Curated annotation (Swiss-Prot):
Residues 512-515 are annotated as: G3. Residues 457-626 form the tr-type G domain. Residues 466-473 are annotated as: G1. This is Translation initiation factor IF-2. It is found in: Cytoplasm. It comes from Brucella canis (strain ATCC 23365 / NCTC 10854 / RM-666). One of the essential components for the initiation of protein synthesis. Protects formylmethionyl-tRNA from spontaneous hydrolysis and promotes its binding to the 30S ribosomal subunits. Also involved in the hydrolysis of GTP during the formation of the 70S ribosomal complex. It comes from the Bacteria.
């Protein structure tokens, strides 16, 4: 087997397998090591596949550290390839560090021979070729020539590379072994240092515990001198109970300290310290004060509880805090609970206030005292957060949240709840509830009772109502002796006018209301603010729709009616017809046996005007109208407008009290300070008493017509009320828009179903009442297909912002008795926005109606022409099928619409392509004649079918 052949190629390759040293497989894991005094530390533990010596196997380590003499016996005679192998094997086992010596109580370790043999000797036979290659290598002379001849250059290079790689791996393994030994040495040194530190702390802790035990013993002896009975009980308990663990004085003949531990067994933890304050020891032999002494029974019980766990368990729980070094005996306050003394190292304890609360709670539990529940009156608004509710009840928000969780509601302290839920919570916690609302800011402003002793007679407020063009304003003009009608556009009243006249030394306040149907709301406001209603009826026109509406408003307001039959000077006047027509509406005049006063007047010729005023004064005397002029003013807004030079101007009627310049008032959602008072003749007055109409200057904004106003104490109150009303108005507007708008899907469905078109408008008027009338009139014009959408409306001139809004919404601008400024006109020209001006509401409504009619889709009208019966069907080249027909009814026109009817079922509708008679195109074929007809894009025609001819017309519609 020693002979080599040329084909034995594996001779020089196999030995290099013995040179490879596998990298030691290291697995790391982390464990938590516990030390005394409750300290823990995370330790990295490495698990290796190679078997290392443990600290308790000292003989094995020493044997492993020495080189094995038997293995390298033939090393000097081996080939150079085997030298690195033995060197690396010896080097791998050489750098094993000597472990720390085990204590003398440790058991002897096992023999070392079985440990070292598998490490080196078992690797070599695995990679050797069978047949004793190692024994034959000392004879190179016999094989040297043969070996050189059989090894090729590539094989020599492979062997050289294998040797170089083995040397590199050897160096790496040696460096890795050195680092591992260094790390283990550092780890052993650190552990030794920690053990020394732990032993030192344990010794200090034992010394401190001994000192505390001695101090406690002396304190108990001092207390026993004053209280002999508790001392006897304490002694009996001490005799019947073993000494506490590491805390009691030792018996005679027994050394101080803990219980001795058996050999080879670690100590079972440090003694548990008694939780007493350090300053309890007597200083300089002086007895402690009575306040610092504990009761003997209580101290023994506490010691039993503290030491019981140490006696029963294997190891007591270590103390968290580090021992404190006492500087001197006179340091009395050393044991005081402070932040610095209780937060040393990792320890942490309760604060002084927490300890005090705990002591108070313990005292109450011992004395069986319960904390008295304080019931409070909790003010709850309409909405409140849980945190604010807890603060008002002086309760913890956690308790409220727990209560709500029991009720099945998961809420946070910042969540908002309503008043009902807050009331339930407050009552559940034993508090009384006082509900308040945002509307409470208006309490005490309106409907304040008058002082009956200070009331005086006031002028009556008379409203003139009736149908349009029945002479209401002409009658008021005749009474005032002033030409009011000539100043109004179109001769009709556009807004309420309030005037005051004097008759026989007595004042009468008149309110003129429009008679047009669009001004229904203004008539209603006039009736609500009045004492007497004069119903004007034309003698030649009798009762009209607006007359009936005025009667209903007066009855709804509960005011008496005086009928003024006007235009008696006309030839067609019939006053008796008017009285009879009023009977149908339950208005019974005196001449017809009723109680309603009626006067025949002529505003044009000023006939019987005195009788009408006397009837008004008589009715006012029967009503006995009184008011308190010394109280704060209260009334109603008749009309409001935005004047360019004076700002917001409101025409108001004082109902109670007296209004002065400088008063702060609230009108609807607006407030302001009265800057000036102007009467109906344009004169500035210093005060306005009850039933006096005046114009107020100084409001922050333009109020709505019909709003009530009242004088308040200060600006803060006025601002609060105005903000509350503005918030209500915004909420209503949002709710109305959201309810009308809905979701996008609903809008699209509505448009698909109804196909509603909108006509957007921006309306600006002179007064708020006129804008309201225009809005109501335009709403009535709307249908299911088209309606007017008012993007914005307001009192005042047309501004540039109105033009921008109209441009954004693609709306038209309408000005009623107002004009646009220069900037607005220029902007409208640039943007292409149309601005229309109107003075009469009739014209405005007619134009908008015509524009809305243009949005309507034209109506499709169908006119029947005639029927024709198909007699024969012909196939004609380049034309298709042609029906030979006879007109049986009416006529058939070329280009008319046709329907193909088969068995009384319409199977096709289209247009007639050709209409011929004897090969000639004709315009129409009358009844009884035959013709040929062809349809557009349709050939399915049969003999016997009926053709119906009709004409379609599209007619534009109007509203």
């Amino acid at each position: 087997m020693s002979d080599k052949t040329n084909d034995d190629k594996t001779l020089s390759v196999n030995p290099k397998k013995t040179l490879t040293l596998k990298r030691p497989g290291v697995e790391q894991s982390t464990v938590r090591q516990n030390f005394s005094h409750g300290r823990t530390k995370a330790v990295v533990v490495e698990t290796k596949k190679r078997k290392f010596s443990r600290p308790d196997e000292k003989p094995e380590v020493e044997a492993a550290a020495a080189p094995k003499p038997a293995a390298p016996a033939a090393a000097p005679q081996q080939a150079p390839a085997s030298a690195p192998v033995s060197a690396s094997a010896a080097q791998a086992s050489a750098p094993q560090p000597a472990p720390v010596k085990a204590p003398a109580t440790k058991a002897p370790a096992a023999p070392s021979a079985p440990v070292t043999k598998p490490h080196v000797a078992q690797q070599r036979p695995v990679h050797q070729r069978p047949g004793g290659q190692q024994a034959q290598r000392p004879r190179p002379a016999d094989r040297s020539g043969m070996v050189l001849n059989t090894l090729s250059r590539s094989e020599m290079d492979a062997r050289r590379r294998a040797l170089e790689e083995a040397q590199i791996r050897e160096v790496e393994e040696r460096a890795r072994a050195v680092e591992e030994a260094k790390r283990r040495a550092e780890e052993d040194a650190r552990r030794a240092k920690e053990r020394e530190e732990s032993a030192r702390r344990q010794a200090e802790e034992e010394a401190r515990l001994k000192a505390e035990a001695e101090a406690r013993r002396k304190a108990e002896e001092e207390a026993a001198k004053r209280m002999p009975q508790p001392e006897a009980r304490s002694e009996r308990r001490d005799d019947a109970r073993p000494a506490p663990y590491g805390a009691r004085p030792q018996q005679a003949g027994r050394p101080q300290g803990g219980r001795p531990q058996p050999a080879g067994r670690p100590q079972q933890g440090s003694p548990r310290p008694a939780p007493i304050i350090a300053d309890a020891a007597p200083i300089a032999g002086k007895p402690l004060p009575q306040s610092q002494l504990r009761k003997p029974g209580q101290s023994d019980d506490d010691d039993d509880r503290r030491s019981g766990a140490a006696r029963r368990g294997v190891a007591a729980k270590p103390e968290v805090r580090a021992p404190k070094v006492v500087k001197g005996e006179d340091d009395r306050r050393r044991g005081k609970l402070t932040l610095t003394s209780n937060l040393e190292e990792e320890g942490r304890s309760r604060s002084l206030s927490a300890m005090r609360r705990r002591q108070e709670k313990f005292k109450r539990s011992q004395m069986q005292e319960t904390r008295e529940k304080i019931s409070r009156e909790v003010t709850i608004p309409e909405t409140i957060t849980l945190q604010e509710l807890a603060q008002r009840m002086a309760e913890r928000s956690v308790d409220i949240i727990k209560y709500l969780m029991k009720q099945g509601q998961m809420m946070k302290p910042g969540d908002v709840i309503d008043a009902d839920t807050a009331q339930l919570i407050a009552e559940e916690f034993g508090h009384t509830v006082k509900r308040v609302a945002e509307s409470d800011v208006e309490e005490g402003i309106f409907d304040v009772a008058d002082n009956e002793s200070a009331t005086v007679s006031r002028p009556p407020v008379v409203t003139i109502m009736g149908h349009v063009d029945h002479g209401k304003t002409s009658l008021l003009d005749a009474i005032r002796h002033a030409n009011v009608v000539s100043g109004e556009a179109g001769g009709i009243t556009q807004h309420i006018g309030a005037y005051q006249v004097v008759q026989n030394g007595q004042k009468i306040t008149f309110i003129d209301t429009p008679g047009h149907a669009a001004f229904t709301a203004m008539r209603a406001r006039g009736a609500q603010a009045t004492d007497i209603a004069i119903l004007v009826v034309a003698a030649d026109d009798s009762v009209m729709p607006q007359t009936i509406e005025s009667i209903n408003h007066a009855k709804a307001a509960g005011v008496p009616i005086i009928v003024a039959i006007n235009k008696i000077d006309k030839p067609a006047a019939d006053p008796q017809k008017v009285r009879t027509a009023l009977l149908q509406h339950e208005v019974f005049v005196e001449s017809m046996g009723g109680e309603v006063l009626d006067v025949e007047v002529s505003a044009k010729n000023k006939i019987n005007l005195d009788k009408l005023l006397d009837a008004v004064l008589l009715q006012a005397e029967m009503l006995d109208l009184k008011a308190d002029p010394d109280r704060t003013a209260e009334g109603v807004v008749i009309e409001a407008q935005l004047d360019r030079g004076r700002g917001s101007v409101a025409t108001v009627l004082i109902q109670k009290g007296t209004l002065h310049p400088g008063d702060i008032l609230v009108a609807g959602s607006e407030w302001g300070r009265v800057r000036a008072l102007v009467n109906d003749r344009g004169e500035h007055v210093k005060e306005a008493g009850p039933a006096m109409p005046v114009e107020i200057l100084g409001l922050q904004g333009t109020p709505q017509a019909g709003d009530r106003f009242a004088v308040v104490a200060n600006e803060a109150k006025a601002r609060e009320i105005a903000e509350y009303r503005q918030r209500l108005a915004r909420d209503k507007a949002v709710a109305r828009q959201s309810g009308a708008r809905g979701s996008l899907e609903q809008m699209m469905n509505q448009l698909q179903v109804s196909g509603t078109k909108e006509f957007p408008l921006v309306i600006k008027g002179d007064v708020q009442g006129s804008i309201e009338a225009i809005t109501n009139a335009l709403d009535k014009l709307g249908t299911d297909e088209v309606r007017a959408r008012i993007v914005h409306s307001g009192a005042g001139g047309i501004t540039e912002s109105d033009v921008s809004l109209a441009e954004a919404s693609n709306a038209a601008i309408i000005g009623f008795n107002v004009r646009a400024n220069k900037q607005a006109r220029n902007s409208a020209e640039q943007q292409g926005i149309e601005i229309r001006y109107y003075n009469i509401i009739y014209d405005l409504i007619d134009d908008v109606k015509a524009a809305m009619s243009g949005l309507l889709s034209p109506e499709r009208r169908e006119t029947f022409l005639g029927n024709a019966e198909i007699l024969e069907v012909f196939n004609i080249t380049k034309v298709g099928k042609v029906a030979g027909c006879r007109v049986t009814e009416g006529k058939v026109e070329r280009g008319a619409g046709v329907r193909l009817i088969r068995d009384n079922v319409v199977i096709h509708e289209g247009k007639l392509k050709t209409l011929k008679r004897f090969k000639d195109e004709v315009a129409e074929v009358p009844s009884g004649q035959e013709c040929g007809m062809a349809f557009e894009n349709y050939d399915d025609i049969r003999a016997g079918d009926v053709i119906e001819a009709f004409r379609v017309e599209h007619v534009s519609r109007t509203l």
